């Protein structure tokens, strides 16, 4: 999610305040080490989730009689004030307090006294941060799922409007067969539908509560983890304390789903870039998604799709970073895991921003239908239809394939497309394949038209305009 945390003073104090853990040590941490090990620079964006988790924990402690009712009231009052300070940009984030957790706890203690010191009873920063990350990531996934839906709705509108707009379908970037632009766009709907399913499935594993696992072995206090899970909207608790505080597979899974989504959008971006080039001339993008050149006044560059391609590498890199981070860690928690947040945050930010832009950009595509159709006059796009025609007339497919290949070669020599041959010319081109020429009749010319080719693919998943419209309607039903 885009970081909206107010800026704050993150400098270290000239004094050496006592750390939450300093009693064990005989000398203070050096300023260099403080800066190297602190995470408050980036984990303060989880402040809202940290407060939510702490309030649920405090309610449980009071409910179990571990802290008093007045302690709970003081904690709730202090947290409300802290939340307001953060939202107004008035909270003083301090490097000396290392991370979001201790910064908030120290401020709470300053506001409410001993009640603030009692808040950490029965928990560790290990299970606290694992809970914060899951809360934050759950929010991010919900936002991403909504944005995928926005993108898909706009994509369906463009696909419906172009359900019968013919264009070349490509394999190996060579003209293959006629399809419609709407059918082509619906391929990306299906890709992002699977992406949404992956995020929704990942959310199930994110939505498990680590809190109560403490440092690694659980706690001796009579806590009620199920109560906290209900308070925070988790489906269940994590059932092994070692696993709960130490693994980040849920974050890796999220980054993997993000990499797949970005890969799909990168492929789409590559096509938009190609289609916008004068060599294709299939579409134009709205000016607000393009930039010019500082030296070439005629240029209109598709910078947004190009950056989507580039940022896909960035998201893939974050996935590799997290996999590498986890691969060598013994159980349980290690400081290595502090490095999980920046790749995770950056991945979510990139995906969210990309989806927001794409949902708008898709509505600004101007389709150049004449150019799309004109491209079908090159590359013998209906050659397969001619082969299928011969097969339906009784010729074995391999013989039909050979006969049509000979016809294409003859068309290349003549410099024309297959529909420009007369019936006799087509028969002559296929004469070397026994039985092929005899199968041809005047009805072949209806088969060789673009419309004939498109209409013949009239089955579920096919490119016939009627099927594209049906696919759009079905997709809208699934979206709700």
Curated annotation (Swiss-Prot):
Reactions listed under catalytic activity: 2-(N(omega)-L-arginino)succinate = fumarate + L-arginine
InterPro entries according to UniProt: Arg_succ_lyase_C, Argininosuccinate_lyase, Fumarase/histidase_N, Fumarate_lyase_CS, Fumarate_lyase_fam, Fumarate_lyase_N, L-Aspartase-like
Associated pathway: Amino-acid biosynthesis; L-arginine biosynthesis; L-arginine from L-ornithine and carbamoyl phosphate: step 3/3
Enzyme superclass (EC): lyase
Single GO term (MF): argininosuccinate lyase activity
Gene Ontology CC annotations of this record: cytosol
Enzyme Commission identifier(s): 4.3.2.1
Alphabetic keyword roster: Amino-acid biosynthesis, Arginine biosynthesis, Cytoplasm, Lyase
Residue spans of biased composition, Polar residues class: 1-17
UniProt-listed Pfam families: ASL_C2, Lyase_1
GO annotation terms (biological process): arginine biosynthetic process via ornithine; L-arginine biosynthetic process
Subcellular location: Cytoplasm
Region (Disordered): 1-24
Entry's family note: Belongs to the lyase 1 family. Argininosuccinate lyase subfamily.
Full protein name: Argininosuccinate lyase
Phylogenetic classification of the source organism: Bacteria, Pseudomonadati, Pseudomonadota, Betaproteobacteria, Rhodocyclales
Gene responsible for this protein: argH
